[in-house]
């Protein structure tokens, strides 16, 4: 019994409160009050906001369009491309005849019209507005000529950097982020900058033998002023968050100099320095400023000569199409008379497989061996650029050939606008890195740029259409359906059975034609 009593724990007393003030401290025991019981709140029902999807459906009757859309199981006829990609076509057996009309081409882009009008106002002339496109001419300088050109590239970059430093010293953009308007009018003027930097320019010219032309150095000052102005406009319009114009590094990959048309004489430029110059095309009929570019990777000297293309009439067909860019096929084209599928993604993967293997190997070497020599690093980086250039050249070849064919067959093209920037961002964890790489190689944004340029050149209107609900909407009845990962769109209300990409291409065409139809 005594052992059992020993194991029992003694009772712990309540907390003590010590009252001070007198010499003797009195110990007072205070009992804790039980907590007040609060009335229980009734559970509040959370209301979930429901948003109705805005329908993009346009009926076939409104656009005078047929209900025709091919079934997924069909036999395509292949089109010769003279390149690495595939181009297949399926024709509508009940297609209507296409009307033709004459159109004067090329069409001058609105941005070019605006720039030419501003130039006419500034120079107080009435020059006609023309379509300008650049022509590439490769030159083959000798070793002595290459040495002279390399020094000229270096001096051009030095003059550009010194002019930008001078403009920055005048505090055009304040530390608070505000722009000093009075300073921009005075400083961002090439004549005032030229006067201020006359001594620096003359010293740079005297430092070389044979000396560089003064007008070429003046072009560097003019280029710096124009680049500064464009950076300011981008900052004002909110396209750039922080104003920052960086100077050129002398050892950069691509170097340029700007040459005036007066220096081109006798199938060469600057005949006092370069009496003879080999070129891929004759250097004649040059009446505008030309830029000479040197690429250190390819070791090529290329002249970009602006040419005016004269206007002429072309027989165009009244035929419009919708294009859905995607990952199964690069492009899916729909028109009332035919559908086309251009370059399946499997072919892109197979053609770029070897290049990406070598790129991954080089990247692994750079990551695993950080303490490499500078020469070794330069070689590895040059190899990276080489294999990336091969991939871009393949895509460039496909872009130009596809856009040329589309522009010649259709008079209006409605293409879906993909937000590739948000898809390729690090925040997007849904897509895998392999899919992101495929999207990056296809480069849809560059394709749309090239297609619009070709459209202006050959008289075809190109419209960018938002892809909102184009895949989910039935092109026949307008019912919205979640497809998920299925490749076929099967409508439950009207019974339409078609390929999902072709259905999306038809919806893109309808949305693109909607404002055009209302204007008519």
From Swiss-Prot:
Q: Where are the transmembrane segments?
A: none
Q: Does the keyword Metal-binding apply?
A: yes
Pfam families per the record?
Answer: Cas12f1-like_TNB (PF07282), HTH_OrfB_IS605 (PF12323), OrfB_IS605 (PF01385)
Q: Which domain of life is it from?
A: Viruses
Region entry Disordered, spans? 23-44
Which residues does the annotation say bind Zn(2+)? 474, 477, 491, 494
UniProt keywords, alphabetically:
DNA recombination, DNA-binding, Metal-binding, Transposition, Zinc
Q: What InterPro entries does the annotation carry?
A: Cas12f1-like_TNB (IPR010095), Recombinase/Transposase-rel (IPR051491), Transposase (IPR001959), Transposase_put_HTH (IPR021027)
* One example GO MF annotation: metal ion binding
Q: Which BP terms from GO are recorded?
A: DNA recombination; transposition
* Family, similarity comment: In the central section; belongs to the transposase 2 family.
Q: Which PANTHER family match?
A: PTHR36172, RESOLVASE-RELATED
Q: Which NCBIfam families match?
A: guided_TnpB, IS200/IS605 family accessory protein TnpB-like domain
Task: Identify this protein by name.
Answer: TnpB-like protein L770
Organism encoding this protein: Acanthamoeba polyphaga mimivirus
């Amino acid at each position: 019994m005594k052992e059992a009593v020993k194991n029992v724990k003694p009772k712990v007393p309540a907390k003590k409160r010590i009252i001070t003030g007198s010499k003797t401290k009195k110990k007072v025991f205070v009992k804790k009050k039980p907590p007040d019981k609060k009335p229980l709140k009734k559970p509040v029902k959370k209301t979930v906001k429901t948003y109705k999807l805005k329908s993009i459906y346009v009926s076939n009757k409104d656009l005078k369009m047929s209900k025709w859309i091919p079934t997924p199981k069909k036999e395509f006829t292949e089109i010769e491309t003279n390149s690495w990609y595939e181009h297949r076509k399926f024709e509508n057996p009940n297609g209507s005849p296409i009307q033709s009309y004459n159109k004067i081409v090329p069409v001058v882009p609105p941005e070019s019209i605006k720039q030419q009008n501003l130039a006419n106002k500034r120079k107080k002339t009435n020059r006609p507005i023309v379509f300008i496109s650049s022509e590439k001419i490769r030159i083959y300088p000798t070793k002595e000529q290459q040495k002279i050109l390399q020094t000229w590239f270096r001096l051009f970059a030095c003059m550009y950097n010194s002019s930008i430093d001078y403009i920055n010293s005048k505090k055009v953009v304040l530390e608070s982020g505000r722009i000093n308007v009075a300073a921009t009018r005075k400083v961002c003027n090439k004549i005032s900058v030229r006067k201020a930097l006359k001594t620096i320019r003359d010293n740079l010219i005297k430092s070389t033998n044979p000396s560089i032309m003064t007008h070429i150095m003046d072009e560097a000052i003019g280029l710096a002023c124009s680049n500064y102005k464009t950076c300011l406009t981008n900052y004002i319009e909110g396209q750039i968050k922080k104003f920052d114009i960086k100077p050129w590094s002398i050892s950069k990959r691509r170097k340029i100099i700007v040459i005036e048309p007066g220096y081109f004489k006798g199938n060469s430029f600057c005949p006092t320095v370069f009496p003879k110059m080999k070129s891929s095309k004759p250097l004649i009929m040059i009446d505008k400023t030309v830029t000479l570019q040197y690429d250190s990777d390819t070791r090529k000297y290329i002249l970009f000569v602006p040419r005016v293309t004269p206007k002429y009439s072309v027989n165009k067909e009244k035929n419009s199409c919708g294009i859905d860019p995607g990952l199964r096929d690069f492009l899916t084209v729909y028109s009332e008379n035919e559908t086309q599928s251009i370059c399946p993604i499997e072919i892109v993967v197979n053609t770029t497989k070897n290049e990406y293997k070598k790129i991954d190997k080089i990247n692994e070497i750079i990551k695993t061996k950080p303490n490499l020599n500078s020469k070794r690093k330069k070689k590895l980086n040059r190899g990276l650029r080489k294999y990336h250039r091969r991939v871009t050249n393949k895509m460039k070849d496909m872009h130009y050939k596809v856009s040329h064919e589309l522009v010649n067959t259709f008079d209006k093209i409605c293409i879906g606008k993909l937000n590739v920037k948000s898809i390729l961002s690090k925040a997007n964890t849904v897509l895998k890195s392999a899919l992101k790489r495929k999207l990056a190689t296809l480069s849809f944004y560059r394709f749309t740029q090239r297609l619009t340029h070709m459209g202006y050149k050959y008289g075809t209107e190109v419209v960018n259409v938002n892809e909102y609900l184009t895949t989910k909407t039935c092109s026949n009845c307008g019912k919205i359906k979640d497809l998920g990962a299925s490749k076929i769109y099967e409508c439950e209300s009207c019974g339409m059975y078609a390929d999902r990409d072709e259905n999306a291409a038809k919806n893109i065409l309808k949305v693109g034609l909607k404002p055009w139809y209302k204007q008519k």
